[in-house]
Amino acid sequence: MIVQMYGVSWCPDCRAARKFLDSYGIEYTEIDVEGDPAASAEVVRRVGKRAVPQLVIDGEWFQPYKPGRGLLVDELHERLGIPRA
């Protein structure tokens, strides 16, 4: 499985997504959209706005956080194939 996370260092939602991935030992490549204009443009092209965090799991884009709902833990478990405890 190839996982990429588009985010920024100061974003609390990005920190929550990083913590989730790290807690399950999921390897991922982090792409800083603030320091990489091409990456920022790619996020806008794919999702219509500069919204982070964004995960790309085996080529499929997914926003793991929704305002008012927080980190989408159940969906992350499902998409990453992590069994629920």
Question: Residue ranges of each PLM-predicted region?
Answer:
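Local sequence-structure signature of Cys/Sec-based thiol-disulfide redox active-site neighborhoods
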Residues: M1-E27
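Structural micro-motif
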Residues: V47-I57
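Thiol-based oxidoreductase modules, predominantly thioredoxin-like and allied folds used
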Residues: I26-S40, K49
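Rhodanese-like catalytic fold shared by cysteine-dependent sulfurtransferases
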Residues: R45-R46, I82
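Nucleotide phosphate-binding site architecture
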Residues: P12, E34, Q63
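Non-catalytic, surface beta->alpha helical segment in thiol-disulfide oxidoreductase systems
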Residues: I57-A85
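Positions that flank functional sites
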Residues: D36, V43, G59
